[in-house]
């Protein structure tokens, strides 16, 4: 039986904070005056929480006091199956939802979390992160930290996804480096619920996330402890990471994907393109209803068809009419953003490519075959090895299109 299709990045990351439902939007507008008052009040209370957490030593009393004060701020921390917590395990593994996940888990148990891709600073320390050296030395530093004989031992809380998701659909691919530190890890699941607005937005800063957390009535963090997992004999770190990812995803009722933080960055870039599309459509096609624009659209579609002969012509025309940009249409087709059934190259190729066939005797025939494999029916298959093939496809398609354009200009 074929596994369910993995969700794409558009389902793992929220791009809008406000609700799209009219009733919820009206409720948010009515709540706004109360929320602003809570925000101002909680900002002053939050300063006291920060001072108390700095003044008190790490202990059960400190965690109880700070946890109670955080509940007043609207940050409610709950946990399930706390009896499964094994204090001998030095590495804790969790999914990542908000910039404050490590602070919430630290209210329940003592732990330390390194801040990736950021130098040591006051902001790093004030946010509750552990100050570490450069990224290249991170793993070795963490191994030394876990090997220390300090009592009581302080476990590491690591987020192998390295980027936060919306916590509803699936998990990013787990990086292997957190699983190379120790042979035993204890996973935990983290679920976050918040009324009226999204829990997190893909391109928001931690400051804006903090302000929204203080604005809404409450945010509930639900932590569930799982049994410790030991590395199997001869198991590589990548295999260990994949096994833990599938377990955490199963406990959350989600799907473990192969998407990485790089896919999130590309998704955020593509989210900005729709704002530019109406302008590009107007500049490329000044009068859409006129016959001349239809002729121009057909001409551009045939040019793209010459570059990507396995793509149906009507699919190319439809996406060109929407984007008005040849480069963007080629990108959408190569990345699988436009669904279609690939044509056979011999059937889908048109007569115009014949004059330029001698120029590309080998690449013109060999390149479309792996491209056709990219657009499988299963989204899981489309995501496999995307990073390895995408750049080569971009360069080939765009180079071929520009060379044909230069030939016609001559």
UniProtKB/Swiss-Prot annotation:
InterPro entries: AUP1_CUE, CUE. One of its GO terms (molecular function) is ubiquitin binding. Residues 258-295, 344-369 are annotated as: Disordered. Keywords: Acetylation, Endoplasmic reticulum, Lipid droplet, Membrane, Phosphoprotein, Ubl conjugation. GO terms for biological process: ERAD pathway; lipid droplet formation; lipid droplet organization; lipophagy; protein localization to lipid droplet; response to virus; retrograde protein transport, ER to cytosol. The modification N-acetylmethionine is found at residue 1. Pfam families: CUE (PF02845). PANTHER family: ANCIENT UBIQUITOUS PROTEIN, LIPID DROPLET-REGULATING VLDL ASSEMBLY FACTOR AUP1. Plays a role in the translocation of terminally misfolded proteins from the endoplasmic reticulum lumen to the cytoplasm and their degradation by the proteasome. Plays a role in lipid droplet formation. Induces lipid droplet clustering. Recruits ubiquitin-conjugating enzyme UBE2G2 to lipid droplets which facilitates its interaction with ubiquitin ligases AMFR/gp78 and RNF139/TRC8, leading to sterol-induced ubiquitination of HMGCR and its subsequent proteasomal degradation. Also required for the degradation of INSIG1, SREBF1 and SREBF2. This is Lipid droplet-regulating VLDL assembly factor AUP1. It comes from Mus musculus.
């Amino acid at each position: 039986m074929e596994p369910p299709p993995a969700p794409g990045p558009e389902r793992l990351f929220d791009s809008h904070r406000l609700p799209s439902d009219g009733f919820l939007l009206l409720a948010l507008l009515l709540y706004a005056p109360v929320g602003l008052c809570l925000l101002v009040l909680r900002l002053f209370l939050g300063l006291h929480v920060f001072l108390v957490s700095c003044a008190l030593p790490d202990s059960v009393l400190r965690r109880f006091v700070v946890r109670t004060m955080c509940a007043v701020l609207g940050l409610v921390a709950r946990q399930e199956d706390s009896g499964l917590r094994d204090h001998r395990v030095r590495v804790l593994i969790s999914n990542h939802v908000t910039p404050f996940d490590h602070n919430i888990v630290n209210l329940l148990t003592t732990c330390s979390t390194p801040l990736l891709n950021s130098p040591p600073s006051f902001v790093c320390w004030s946010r509750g992160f552990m100050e570490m050296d450069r990224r290249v030395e991170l793993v070795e530093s963490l191994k030394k930290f876990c090997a220390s004989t300090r009592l009581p031992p302080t476990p590491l809380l690591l987020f192998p996804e390295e980027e936060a998701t919306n916590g509803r659909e699936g998990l990013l691919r787990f990086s292997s480096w957190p699983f190379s530190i120790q042979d035993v890890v204890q996973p935990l699941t983290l679920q976050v619920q918040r009324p009226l607005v999204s829990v997190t937005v893909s391109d928001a800063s931690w400051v804006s996330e903090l302000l929204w957390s203080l604005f809404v009535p409450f945010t509930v963090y639900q932590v569930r402890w799982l049994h410790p997992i030991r590395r199997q004999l001869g198991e590589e770190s990548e295999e260990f990471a994949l096994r833990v990812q599938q377990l955490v995803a199963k406990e959350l009722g989600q799907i473990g994907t192969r998407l990485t933080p790089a896919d999130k960055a590309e998704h955020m870039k593509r989210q900005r393109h729709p704002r530019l599309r109406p302008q590009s459509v107007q500049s490329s096609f000044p009068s859409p209803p006129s016959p001349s624009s239809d002729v121009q659209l057909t001409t551009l579609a045939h040019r793209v068809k010459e570059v990507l002969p396995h793509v149906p012509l009507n699919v190319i025309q439809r996406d060109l009419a929407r984007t008005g940009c040849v480069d963007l249409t080629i990108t959408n087709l190569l990345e699988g953003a436009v669904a279609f059934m690939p044509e056979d190259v011999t059937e889908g190729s048109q007569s115009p490519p014949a004059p330029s066939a001698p120029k590309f005797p080998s690449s013109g025939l060999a390149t479309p075959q792996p491209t056709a494999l990219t657009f499988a029916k299963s989204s899981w298959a489309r995501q496999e090895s995307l990073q390895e093939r995408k750049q080569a496809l971009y360069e080939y398609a765009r180079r071929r299109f520009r060379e044909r354009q230069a030939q016609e200009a001559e």
